[in-house]
Every structure is written in C-alpha cells, then in structure tokens.
C-alpha cells in the first residue's frame, strides 16, 4: 500500500478513537492499488470523538481548522471554542503547501484556498465527522439511510476504510468533480451484488427524480 497511507494509519491507530480512510483513497484500498492521483487524505471519524481527535492532532503540532462554508475556516485553539456548523475539519502543519490561509476581519477566521498540488507528505489530514448507532453507520445527509457497521468499515492489511458503496453515495452529490467518475467506474467493476443493491436503494431514496448513476 501507498507509503503515505501507511504512515497516516500509524499516526492515527491506537489513540482511543475510531477512524477509517474515506474518499478516493478508500476506493483504492478496496481495489488494492492506487488508481489515480489524490488531492489529500480524508478520514471518516465520529462526532462523539471530535474533541479527542482535535486535541491529539494539536499535540502532534498540527494546526486545526473547522470549515465554515463560504471559503472560510475557524482556527481551533481550544476545543471549548468551536462553531461546529460543518462536519469537517482539516489539520495541517505550519509549512503545508496545500492550503493558503488569509486573515479576515474576524478573530480566528481565515479565508482558505486549497491548492491542487497532490499530497505527497504527511502534512495535511481532513476529518469528516459522522454519526452511528449501535449497529449502523448513518449517512450524514439523511440518517434514515444507513449501512451496517460490519459492512461499512472494511479493512485492507489492517487499515480501516469506508466501504465503496457508502463512499460512492457521498460522491454522488458532485459527480463532475475530478476523479469521482473514475472512482465510480473502478469501484463498480469490483463491488458485489449486495453492495450494488445497497447503493441503488440509497440513490433512489436520495434522488427520487433520478441520478446520473441510476440505474446501476
């Protein structure tokens, strides 16, 4: 497996919180090979462990920002002072070349500009927070759409990753984004009948008027 993914997994494992790789890297972990260049590392995590993750990343020297929408982010210096209007945070080193932060008139709020340079160093991680119950992972956009945890979190060489059907459901909101269609094509070629059926049912619920990826 890719050395960057291995190092990230070593950084995150055994620190008291659950996680799984998501996004394009999760598709590659499912396939068993790198299929394209990836912009960054995306990690699925859970809301209940958000503070613990922030504090751990800060202890490693990472700067932590929560996304606000509108091209802005809030620098989290204290977990007691969060806005929590979006489900994702990003953690970067001081010298990370992947993001440019510009001060606004508001204290602790920055304009953000992500550079599509492709990540090659362990200097940036984005966490996307989700909910779960005792048995299922809940889709963030509609909790009624759920997938058994045993099916949602898979492993490749001991590295946890989000299953392809759930990854593709998240990617379905922006199919024109670079790499998303190839992720769909590559994953669909290898998904089993149960995975395809779950994705088909989920797309039908989320897009009752139809979707580019329907029917499967």
Where are these regions (language model features)?
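Compositionally biased terminal segments of proteins
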Residues: 1-216
């Amino acid at each position: 497996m890719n050395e960057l993914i291995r190092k990230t997994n070593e950084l995150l494992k055994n620190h008291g919180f659950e996680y799984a790789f998501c996004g394009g890297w999760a598709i590659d972990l499912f396939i068993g090979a790198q299929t394209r260049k990836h912009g960054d590392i995306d990690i699925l995590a859970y809301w209940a462990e958000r503070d613990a993750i922030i504090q751990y990343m800060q202890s490693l020297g990472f700067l932590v920002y929560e996304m606000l929408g509108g091209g802005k982010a809030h620098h989290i210096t204290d977990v007691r002072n969060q806005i929590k209007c979006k489900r994702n945070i990003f953690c970067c080193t001081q010298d990370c070349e992947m993001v440019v932060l510009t001060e606004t008139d508001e204290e602790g709020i920055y304009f953000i500009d992500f550079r599509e340079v492709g990540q090659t160093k362990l200097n940036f991680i984005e966490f996307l927070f989700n909910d779960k119950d005792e048995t299922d992972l809940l889709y963030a956009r509609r909790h009624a759409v759920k997938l058994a945890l045993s099916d949602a979190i898979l492993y490749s060489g001991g590295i946890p990753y989000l299953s392809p059907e759930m990854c593709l459901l998240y990617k379905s909101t922006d199919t024109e984004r670079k790499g998303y269609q190839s992720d769909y094509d590559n994953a669909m070629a290898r998904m089993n009948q149960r995975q395809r059926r779950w994705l088909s049912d989920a797309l039908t619920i989320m897009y009752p008027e139809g979707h580019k990826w329907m029917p499967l």
